[in-house]
A protein has these predicted regions:
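Glycine-rich phosphate-binding loops at beta-strand->alpha-helix junctions
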Residues: 94-104, 205-210, 214
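Gly/Thr-rich phosphate-binding beta-strand-loop-beta motif of the actin/hexokinase/Hsp70
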Residues: 1-29, 131-162, 179, 209, ...
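Short helix-loop-beta junction
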Residues: 110-118
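Charged, alpha-helix-enriched surfaces in structured cytosolic catalytic cores
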Residues: 45, 49, 72, 76, ...
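Short acidic loop-to-helix transition motifs that present clustered carboxylates
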Residues: 101, 120-131
Length: 222
């Protein structure tokens, strides 16, 4: 059984005891799409060849600005899922965030049906968290372009979710932008070197931020 985690900041395919991670960023490289960390490494070097909103804006509306042969964001999602699935086949369960609109879920299921997998179930990501925690709580999710908060209730050993509240603009990429700006200002004030003036040094700065955030989880400063 396969499990697809559909948060664009943590897109994962779980298969048996292993997982494949490809966050929702696409890079058009010599006519071919590449996704995940490979695309992330080019985000500041080649911004015109990057799209990081195709999951957030999943639809069949014409893609603007254009990015290669994709007609719309649904085409990019299809290509992303092809890359994520690889040679996987069989039944698949979708873990869907509360931020995904019903029309987007319907479109996603249609895309899934064109791939060598069969959707056998859809579950709310927050319900999975609630079942794991086994008590009432609020599930805060960080997506690429927004955050969301979903209340979770427990009754008779079952987790149920309330209405998801969206926090537009408070996503992972916005957080990284804000941190990069603050760090860049410190560089300028202390060394007169501005890492954001050149694409290569700006990219290097951006790539360091996730590991800095991880370190701050256990350290007061880094």
């Amino acid at each position: 059984m396969l499990l697809l985690d559909c948060n664009d900041a943590s897109m994962r395919l779980w298969r048996d005891d292993s997982d494949t991670f490809l966050m929702g960023i696409a890079w058009l490289n010599e006519g071919r799409y590449q996704f995940g960390h490979t695309a992330w490494q080019q985000a500041r070097r080649a911004p015109r060849e990057i799209n990081n909103r195709y999951w957030h804006r999943l639809s069949t509306q014409p893609l603007s600005p254009a990015l290669g042969p994709a007609r719309h964001t649904a085409d990019l999602v299809h290509a992303h899922l092809e890359a994520l699935l690889g040679d996987a086949s069989g039944e698949i369960i979708l873990a869907i965030p509360g931020a995904m609109e019903p029309a987007q879920l319907s479109l996603l299921l249609g895309i899934i049906e064109t791939l060598p997998v069969t959707p056998s179930g859809v579950v709310h990501r927050s319900a999975l968290v609630g079942a794991s925690v086994a008590e009432a709580c609020a599930h805060v999710e960080l997506h690429l372009h927004q955050a969301s908060i979903t209340p979770i209730n427990m009754a008779h050993g079952m987790a149920t979710t309330g209405e998801t509240q969206l926090l537009p603009g408070f996503g992972l990429l916005g957080l990284i932008d804000d941190l990069a700006e603050i760090i860049g200002q410190q560089f300028v004030s202390q060394t007169r070197f501005d890492p954001q003036r050149r694409a290569d040094t700006e990219q290097t700065l951006y790539e360091q931020i996730p590991s800095l955030l991880q370190a701050l989880a256990t350290q007061s400063e880094v």
